[in-house]
Swiss-Prot record:
GO cellular component: mitochondrion; nucleus
Family: Belongs to the OAF3 family.
Assigned keywords, A-Z: Cytoplasm, DNA-binding, Metal-binding, Mitochondrion, Nucleus, Repressor, Transcription, Transcription regulation, Zinc
GO molecular function, one term: zinc ion binding
Species for this entry: Eremothecium gossypii (strain ATCC 10895 / CBS 109.51 / FGSC 9923 / NRRL Y-1056) (Yeast)
Lineage, highest ranks first: Eukaryota, Fungi, Dikarya, Ascomycota, Saccharomycotina
Record protein name field: Oleate activated transcription factor 3
Cited SMART domains: GAL4
Gene Ontology process terms (BP): positive regulation of transcription by RNA polymerase II
Length: 795
């Protein structure tokens, strides 16, 4: 009898629990036992000693691991087909002087740290900043007008002012100086008023309280018509009664009553007025609506800062009332719409306020319970002891109390629907776990006739999507995620609303898909076929083009004869989307510039990149502070990508020169630097070593798919000569960015053109150019502010 033939398949053994697993399951980073015991990070598989030998050939997994990356980096990132790692093997925590926050796996920050090309750019920025503080400090003197701006902006302003004196064209000089000074003055004033402290809060409330006639006859009707549909958290009658009661009491007494909740009502009036002001200001209709001129004459800049001061004075962190909760939600809404940095550069502040709002909802009973058992709510004891509830029932007969109960329950349901929707949206934008940890599938609520009530029926799908992502973000199953997104989009199509909220929801879904696709594209290629990798690459470019078309339509094709008072709201999601596309496109151009022999696609992408930046900064840079802060960063990046044949070579040249000179010892603790330096030592240290060979050894990159992709860009989607009169992106900081890059570009061209294989040792012996240290010093605004704001004597 012939012996049974054994299967010739190597057994993989866990390094922790010594359990075996079949090689077909190797794509999973860790065994189930180690995951259960919390030993995921130390779980690795090795070939069982009894099965080593044979012909001595490496398995595909072994050959992939010997490609230069450290075992942890290579192994954690290895996944089976259909799965993607959104974490890049780590949970990144960012910090600056005023905040510490974790980077969500779907956020724009995640795009930067997931792509090692962009991370190298970030590390390079850190190193350049530290070396340039003293040089920038000498140029930091600015006038008192810009005193409230960050030091990072002050120094660039000073450098730019030097360049104005050298302009040749009088017209361009006058135009540039006017725009430059207008932007600086405007943002400086807004930052000052938005961050000011009030010595006497009640006196400030009296000073800024909107006149009764203007608020009741101008502001409140506009709020009900244009803003309240976007955030339906008020009963219109209750709101009117409360506001009129405040004005009556203030007229009689001449002061506010804390016991009656007057300060919360004042904060509500201020925030409502500010939101209406923003709605009118960002309307792009060419026909001026003169009935709102009185509102535009108000100085609403300090209103949000004053509301922040008024809210805690009613013991908000200890207890809460319904008007306080509504005011908090209104403040959250304002922070999202604010042209200043209300939610933070990475939306990190939104979760803090959302957590407070969620706790307040639970405290007053606005939760899923209001949908499950609405008939069981009894507000009798609240009516008897709380004047805010009494106002809702004041004009009702005893027999109408039941209908009043129903109106309050309905208000609770609307508040919960709004809070739930905001929580899910922020989670889908950032990838962070949602604050509200439960969901349900309620019946349709046709009686509400608003967007948030419709979205309640979709919440269980959003919850499933976020659960799939957050259960194990290092191994997201695309076969589970994609159908959920498709079903959400299909269900959204059933609601025929063309409101700003529908536009925002669709754009958020597209950003989720874009982030997941980006993670799949830059992930390890050892377990992905060349055809699949090219497919991801092409789809990524197609999505970038598609989203850019949405941006162009949004800015250039709005109806100019109809008022669009909702643009103050949708501008924010468009800004978030454009910035994410901008970051991804930067990484793609970096890869093409440094890893592809076929450079035919780079000029096309650079033209597209310039047009996208021009659209972003010309449409949003005049009004939005976060966009303004990124202007110089984007200008320097563009010049590096455009004028340098191999940007990665430039960055590696700088970093290794610093290592050799002993200036970067502390930075070796950073994982990427430690990885690069470790591989550098393994490959011969100071011997003649091609830096690009070193980089490609660490980050193997498939970049042979450019042929034929130029056809994607044959149709010109950007309007020609749209900003021919004055292009903010092209003109602004032109002198300063040239000053930072001029010497380095010359050095790079000489090094790469004449000796592409220049060794690290030879480069380190060369003298540093005077402006090379400034090249990327302001690439990351947060880092730049962190270092420069700590200089003694600076404000």
């Amino acid at each position: 009898m012939m012996p049974l033939k054994k299967r010739q398949r190597q057994t993989l053994v866990c390094s922790n629990c010594k359990r075996r697993k079949s090689r077909c399951d190797r794509g999973k980073p860790a065994c189930g036992n180690c995951i259960r015991l919390g030993n995921r990070e130390t779980c690795h598989y090795f070939i069982s000693p009894s099965e080593k030998g044979g012909d001595g050939g490496d398995s595909p997994g072994e050959s992939a691991g010997s490609n230069g990356a450290l075992e942890r980096w290579q192994f954690v990132r290895a996944h089976s087909c259909g799965r993607v790692d959104l974490t890049a093997g780590r949970t990144v925590v960012f910090g600056k002087r005023s905040a510490v926050y974790v980077a969500g796996v779907l956020s724009t920050d995640a795009v930067r740290y997931r792509d090692l090309y962009l991370e190298l750019l970030s590390v390079f920025s850190h190193a350049a900043i530290k070396k340039t503080v003293s040089q920038l400090h000498a140029q930091a003197q600015v006038g008192a007008q810009e005193a409230s701006l960050p030091n990072s902006v002050k120094r660039v302003i000073r450098m730019e002012d030097e360049g104005m004196l050298q302009e040749s064209s009088p017209y361009i000089l006058a135009k540039h100086k006017k725009v430059h000074q207008s932007l600086v003055d405007g943002f400086a004033q807004s930052r000052y008023e938005g961050r000011q402290q009030f010595a006497d809060v009640e006196e400030a409330a009296k000073q800024h309280l909107v006149e009764r006639y203007i608020f009741l006859q101008k502001v409140l009707p506009a709020f009900k018509k244009h803003v309240l549909p976007l955030i339906p958290i008020y009963d219109e009658r209750m709101l009117c009664v409360t506001v009129e009661q405040l004005y009556d009491d203030y007229q009689k007494r001449g002061k506010f009553s804390a016991k009656n909740g007057d300060l919360i009502t004042v904060a509500t009036i201020l925030l409502i007025t500010r939101l209406v002001y923003l709605a009118i200001r960002f309307d792009k209709c060419s026909v001026v609506n003169v009935k709102y001129n009185r509102i535009l004459e108000l100085d609403t800049e300090p209103y949000a800062a004053l509301a922040y001061e008024l809210l805690p004075r009613d013991k908000l962190l200890r207890k809460v009332t319904l008007p306080q909760l509504q005011c908090l939600i209104l403040l959250r809404f304002h922070n999202w719409c604010s042209p200043m940095d209300g939610d933070g550069e990475s939306l990190q502040y939104s979760n803090v306020l959302m957590g407070t709002i969620y706790a307040c909802c639970k405290e007053i009973g606005a939760s899923w319970l209001s949908f499950k058992e609405p008939d069981k709510y009894d507000f009798a004891k609240a009516r008897g002891s709380n004047s805010r509830f009494t106002m809702a029932f004041a004009e009702m007969e005893p027999g109408e109390v039941d209908s009043a109960n129903e109106s309050v329950v309905k208000l609770y349901q609307q508040i919960w629907a709004v809070v739930l929707h905001w929580d899910r949206n922020v989670s889908m934008l950032t990838g962070l776990e949602p604050i509200i940890g439960t969901s349900m599938k309620p019946a349709a609520m046709s009686s509400y006739n608003n967007w948030y009530a419709d979205m309640i029926s979709l919440d269980y799908l959003k919850w499933q999507l976020l659960t799939r992502i957050n259960e194990d973000p290092s191994e997201v199953n695309l076969e589970e995620v994609k159908p959920i997104i498709s079903e959400i989009r299909q269900r959204l199509g059933q609601f025929t609303s063309e409101s700003e909220l529908a536009f925002e929801q669709e754009l958020i879904l597209q950003l989720v898909e874009l982030s997941i696709l980006h993670a799949a594209f830059i992930g390890p290629t050892s377990n992905v076929s060349a055809a699949e990798h090219r497919k991801n690459y092409q789809e990524l470019l197609e999505r970038i083009i598609h989203l850019s078309g949405i941006f162009i339509t949004y800015f250039h094709d709005p109806p100019t004869t109809n008022h669009q008072y909702g643009r103050f709201y949708t501008n924010k999601i468009v800004e978030v989307a454009m910035y994410r596309v901008y970051q991804i496109l930067t990484g793609l151009i970096l890869r093409i510039s440094s890893a592809c022999q076929d450079q035919s696609l780079k000029p096309t992408l650079m033209k597209f990149y310039k047009n996208l930046c021009s659209l972003y900064f010309n449409e949003l840079g005049y009004d939005y502070y976060q966009v303004f802060k990124r202007l110089f960063e984007a200008k320097v990046k563009y010049k590096i990508l455009e004028q340098t044949a191999n940007p990665v070579f430039i960055m590696l040249r700088y970093l290794f020169a610093e290592i050799q000179s002993g200036n970067m010892e502390s930075m070796k603790s950073q994982e990427l630097i430690g990885l690069i330096y470790g591989e550098y030592k393994k490959m011969g240290g100071e011997l003649n070593l091609d830096m690009m060979d070193l980089w490609n050894h660490i980050v193997p990159t498939q970049c042979d798919h450019n042929i034929g992709l130029n056809s994607l860009f044959t149709t010109e989607i950007f309007p020609t000569d749209q900003y021919s009169d004055y292009n903010l992106f092209v003109s602004f900081y032109d002198y300063a960015s040239n000053k930072l890059t001029e010497d380095t570009n010359q050095a790079a061209e000489k090094s790469i053109a004449h000796n592409p294989s220049t060794s690290i040792h030879d480069l380190c012996k060369g003298g540093a150019s005077p402006h090379f240290d400034l090249l990327e010093g302001i690439l990351d605004p947060l880092d730049f502010m962190t270092y420069l704001d700590s200089i003694p004597g600076e404000t």
